Amino acid sequence: MHQKLLKSAHYIELGSYQYWPVLVPRGIRLYTYEQIPGSLKDNPYITDGYRAYLPSRLCIKSLFILSNETVNIWSHLLGFFLFFTLGIYDMTSVLPSASASREDFVICSICLFCFQVCMLCSVGYHLFSCHRSEKTCRRWMALDYAGISIGILGCYVSGVFYAFYCNNYWRQVYLITVLAMILAVFFAQIHPNYLTQQWQRLRSIIFCSVSGYGVIPTLHWVWLNGGIGAPIVQDFAPRVIVMYMIALLAFLFYISKVPERYFPGQLNYLGSSHQIWHILAVVMLYWWHQSTVYVMQYRHSKPCPDYVSHL
């Protein structure tokens, strides 16, 4: 029996710790914060429940065990299926019933595709962040950040297209500008220090800047439509504000590490800030999808006003 156990075990080394067996397929060991490699040490208030030092096969199998990444993985895996299902429903029911044009189909498809990519990249990172190869972990981290950029791009594409639906010039200006910003973020990831913990604050500033840029086209849209008193502005501006409020709330949870900061070790598996960040990200993207459908239906029900189309 002892020999069979040894043959079915994958051994790892924990620095100054002794060798521990990681049994296949169900005996994936969970570690404390002190035992994990430095690349995983992001939140000292999450004290236990870490997966680490696993090969790819066991990383995948860890999808079905309870760890401190379980909610992070499944929240965005379910988020992916949500947006995939919405894509099918939109293409087969919502858009045809609204007499949508070919452009509408393209824009809505791009938007939902970006959301799905964002969800899958996040799932991939949180699933394989426990890989025994630090190089592999960093590749998945880079994909996670790329996925966030793509998700932001999806919001901008649909938002700019329908906000400047009646003004082709400004629509092209803002779409090109946003695309250039996203590409700049991609190129920034090439820097060897981009994914290090020392650059964590800079990464946050970059993504806040890219997200916050949306205030500029929003204010321009308000001005083009006659100011805050215009009916269309009063109808749609609150939707933009709600989206930004959800994003801000999610970001505050992310950077503050609240509530686990006040309950260290008690929220290792459920209720941590990163899990709340994940759930709010899904809520935000879903809200923006619903807003996109709403404004698309509005654009097809009312013609463009002359004072906008000539500006």
From Swiss-Prot:
- A Pfam short name: HlyIII
Region Required for interaction with SCAP: start-end pairs: 41-60
Primary localization: Golgi
Lumenal topological intervals = 97-105, 164-172, 225-238, 299-311
InterPro entries on file: AdipoR/HlyIII-related
Q: Which residues lie on this side of the membrane: Cytoplasmic?
A: 1-73, 129-140, 196-201, 257-275
What's one GO MF term for it?
ubiquitin-like ligase-substrate adaptor activity
Ranges for the region named Golgi targeting are 61-71, 299-303
Where are the bilayer-spanning segments?
Answer: 74-96, 106-128, 141-163, 173-195, 202-224, 239-256, 276-298
Instruction: Kindly state a single biological-process term from the GO annotations of this entry.
Output: negative regulation of neuron projection development
Tissues of expression: Widely expressed in a range of tissues.
Domain of life, source organism: Eukaryota
Subcellular location per UniProt equals: Golgi apparatus membrane
Q: Which GO terms describe its cellular component?
A: Golgi apparatus; Golgi membrane
Record keywords: Golgi apparatus, Membrane, Transmembrane, Transmembrane helix
Q: How does it sit in the membrane?
A: Multi-pass membrane protein
Q: List the residue ranges of the region (Required for interaction with SREBF2).
A: 1-20
Q: Which PANTHER family match?
A: ADIPOR/PROGESTIN RECEPTOR-RELATED (PTHR20855), PROGESTIN AND ADIPOQ RECEPTOR FAMILY MEMBER 3 (PTHR20855:SF15)
Summary of the function given for this chain in its UniProt record: Golgi-scaffold protein which modulates its interactors acitivies by anchoring them to the Golgi apparatus. Functions as a spatial regulator of RAF1 kinase by sequestrating it to the Golgi apparatus. Acts as a positive regulator of cholesterol biosynthesis by mediating the anchoring of the SCAP:SREBP complex in the Golgi apparatus, thereby promoting SCAP:SREBF2 complex formation, potentiating SREBF2 and SREBF1 processing and enhancing lipid synthesis.
Q: Which family does it belong to?
A: Belongs to the ADIPOR family.
How does it associate, per the subunit comment? Interacts with SCAP and SREBF2; the interactions are direct, increase in low cholesterol conditions and tether SCAP:SREBP complex to the Golgi apparatus. Interaction with SCAP is mutually exclusive with INSIG1. In hepatocytes, interacts with PPARA and HUWE1; the interactions promote PPARA poylubiquitination and HUWE1-mediated degradation. In macrophages, interacts with PPARG and STUB1; the interactions promote PPARG poylubiquitination and STUB1-mediated degradation.
The entry's protein name is Progestin and adipoQ receptor family member 3
Record organism: Homo sapiens
The gene it comes from is PAQR3
